[in-house]
Amino acid sequence: MSKNDHLSDDELSLFREAVQGSKKLRQDTIIHQPSKNFSEQQKQRKSLKEGKNEEFFFSDEFVPLLNEDGPVRYARDGVSKYEVKRLRRGVYVPDVFLDMHGMKQDEAKRELGSMIAYCLKENISCASVMHGIGKHILKQKVPLWLAQHPDVMAFHQAPLEFGGAGAILVLLSIPDR
């Protein structure tokens, strides 16, 4: 009922007659929390700070030494080659998929950082990054970016069921909390 709708005298008396004898209930089950009023400036600063944290590890100038023969693969020092083999065979099933088709490099870098941050927050150890084949720009850059991130234990070209040559399976280290 809007504010412009007015009750006639008959309707008002009928309502009073219907609720006569009822008691007002005291609300005691829900405690209202005061809302946090963030200014737009504070929200922008927070999102900018989070974005920088997610993008921090990826440099286009640093080129890690990766194996160039055969499918793309990488294992950090101390990670068993058996883990890479399990990635290759599809033993690890990715819980998160990032589709980079149509993204520019900066956008792809930002989304990759966001995906890794999300996986760490949600304790997800395996993810799939679908860079596509196209002009090979993202196909070349994604492994270089992944190798720079300290939480990436290993990655391997995905098996056909998860994207084949157009995707990479990433194994992340989940810190104990």
Swiss-Prot record:
Ranges of biased composition (kind: Polar residues): 30-41
Xref: Gene3D superfamilies: 3.30.1370.110
InterPro entries, per the entry: Smr_dom, Smr_dom_sf, SmrB-like
One term of GO molecular function: RNA endonuclease activity
Record keywords: Endonuclease, Hydrolase, Nuclease, RNA-binding, rRNA-binding
Domain Smr: 98-173
Pfam family, one: Smr
Disulfides per UniProt: none
Listed HAMAP family: SmrB
Family note: Belongs to the SmrB family.
Name of the featured protein: Ribosome rescue factor SmrB
Species of origin: Aliivibrio salmonicida (strain LFI1238)
Gene field: smrB
